Structures are given as C-alpha cells and as structure tokens.
Regions:
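N-terminal loops that bind phosphate or other acidic moieties
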Residues: 2-351
Length: 351
C-alpha cells in the first residue's frame, strides 16, 4: 500500500556536530551570552537547518490553503459555509489581514483552492487544485477517502517544491475554511488522546450554547469513528482538504531543508499529522505564536515549543506566521553579520 512518505525524499536529521560550533559562534558575538534571548535559539535552529554559520532568508513565501468542510451543516460555526469563498475572494483582492501582514513581512503570498464548495472568481493569483468541492460531513461518514487524502498530501508537497525551485528557503502556511476548527479539534483529540472538551474552542465566535453544541457533535463523531487510529486514517476521517494539503506541504518543506513557520491551531493540527508520518519534520519548524484558541497551548506543549509571539491571535490565515517572519530575518542576520569579540577588537576578558 502506498504511504504518504513514498513520494517524498527522506527528511534529513539536523547535524548535531554543527550545533556545538554554531553555539560557540553565537556565544562569541559582541554581546553578553544569552542577551538576545529567544533569538539566539532561533538563530541556532536556522543555522542548523541551512547548515551554515552564514544563514540567509531567501524569497520567503506564505501559502494559504482554502477548503470547505461538510461538518459545517451541523451548525458548529456561527458563519455559513459561503463565507469561505467570500474570504478567498477577499484574499485575491488583497483585502485581508494576511495580505497586509505578508506585505509588511516582504513575503510572497499564494492562495490555493484545495476544495472550496462555492465558485471562486477567476484570478491569476489563485492556484486551483480542488480535491473536491468540500469534504463530507464526518458526523455521518469519513470526511474524505484515503485516496483523496493522499492526493491532497501530494498536491501540497508539489506547491512547496514549486517554491523551492524558485529559491524559497523560509515558508509559512495559512488556511481558510468555515468549520475547520472542528476538524482540527478532532485531529488533536485522536492523535494526542486528549478529551474533546480540552480541544474545542469558540472558533469564529460561538456563544456558550453554540460551544456546548459543537462539543457534543464532535464527541459523537469521534465515537462513531473510533476505528480511525493510524495518522492517514485520522486525517481522512476528520480532516479537510486544506489541512491535508498543508500536511503534505510540511513534509515537503522539511525534505527541502526549509525553515517552516507554523501558524495557529489549525496549522498545528496539520503538523500533528505530519509529525506522525515523519517525526523529523519537527526540527524544521519555528512556532510563530500561541493562539488564543483552546487547545493550541496543549499542542505546543506536545511539541516542546516556545512560540515567538503571544498576541492572543485566533484569526488563522497564516497571520501569526507572517508576523513572525521579521524575527526570523533578524535571527539569521545577527548570526551572519554580527561581529565577534575577536573580529571587532572588543575586550571579552572576565571582569
């Protein structure tokens, strides 16, 4: 049986022999050791990923995957499914938060139709790769077939390889899809063996009654699909086409030795699947922020992650990843450009 990793090159482990040398270089920059805080750990990680003491950020890119979810018919979101297509049109017109933030971060932005249910406007900025016109309702049946999940993984990987061929070495992923917090919560619950109540948040703004309804719907769905245990089966049962494409994108980005900016709750749920398929992907991930959405901090704990930002974001779209990109630039720049005590002629003798 074909597995998702068969169409990907292996993910190379980071060079632990280089770690000590990079740490020495960082510690001997013209600053007290540790005084750049979390940026020092980030610079070390980027140096390890790029295998150099002179890292560079080249043609950074953000890919936003959009798709609809059949579970939306269960009333788990206060917004109608049509909002997904409306927001994609907004992305294409340049009017969303991710457009503004990727512009500030000087990042390429690509919008991918992974499976939006409603028609989308024609645009040169849209990459149309729909696996289907929305997933099925996983409260009743699996969201997609295993073959659909595999096709989505391959499509996401192909988009990353496209950007790698253009020189991209830093990449982030965003998403859009009404009810995709429900899919992400079920992925988290099953893959981390966490009660669904700890995974479910208000999403786009559910009130208390709506939150209770969402929890009940998802609890029943998890019970109905108790047989889905293997990561690809979990993805096919509960995931969305945009989440599956993002999973493939993570795997390809790690295999291409890219620095990967991880966004919020939904993006991290896709990483949970990717990690189960290829654990080495984690080494290439920079966690941009701690989302305000319930469950995200538990995911971050699972990955042993210390996010760069804590801004109470809960928008998605890749906004947190875009906001963190300037910090990646800064970390790479200080490692590559900052003088050492010796080269600058600065006295570093103990007081």
């Amino acid at each position: 049986m074909t597995t998702p990793t068969e169409f990907l090159p292996p993910i190379a482990p980071l060079d632990e022999a280089l770690r000590k040398r990079l740490q020495h270089v960082i510690d001997h920059k013209t600053k007290p050791p540790g005084s750049l805080g979390q940026l020092e750990a980030l610079a070390l990680q980027i140096g390890l990923i790029q295998r150099t003491e002179q890292p560079r950020v080249q043609r950074p890119a953000m890919i936003l995957f959009a798709g609809d979810h059949g579970i939306a018919v269960e009333g788990v979101s206060p917004y109608p499914q049509s909002v997904t297509a409306q927001m994609v049109a907004n992305f294409l017109a340049g009017g969303a938060a991710i457009n503004a933030f990727s512009g500030v971060a000087q990042s390429e932005l690509e919008i991918v139709d992974a499976g939006v249910a409603s028609p989308l406007p024609a645009s040169e900025r849209l990459v149309s790769l729909p696996i289907g016109r929305g997933t099925r309702n996983f409260a009743v049946e699996p969201a997609m077939t295993r073959d659909d999940a595999m096709a989505a993984l391959a499509a996401g990987a192909a988009r990353v390889r496209h950007h790698a061929a253009l020189g991209t070495n830093v990449i982030g992923f965003g998403e859009m899809g009404i009810a995709n917090t429900s899919a992400a919560a079920c992925l988290m619950s099953r893959l981390l063996d966490v009660p669904i109540d700890a995974c479910v948040g208000r999403g786009t703004g559910l009130d208390d009654q709506g939150l209770a309804h969402k929890r009940a719907v998802l609890a029943r769905a998890l019970s109905r699909h108790s047989h889905a245990i293997a990561p690809l089966d979990v993805l096919a049962t509960f995931g969305g086409f945009e989440i599956a494409m993002m999973t493939g994108a993570y795997l390809a980005a790690a295999s291409e030795r890219m620095t990967i900016l991880v966004d919020g709750f939904i993006s991290t749920s896709a990483l949970l699947v990717a990690e189960r398929l290829a654990p080495g992907v984690r080494d290439y991930c920079v966690f941009s922020h701690a989302s305000h959405e319930a469950g995200h901090r538990r995911m971050l704990e699972h990955f042993g992650a210390k996010p760069l930002l804590a801004l109470d974001l809960r928008l998605g779209e890749g906004t947190g990843a875009a906001l963190a990109l300037p910090l990646v630039r800064a970390a790479a720049a200080f490692l590559a450009e900052m003088a050492s005590f010796e080269s600058a002629g600065v006295d570093n003798r103990d007081a």
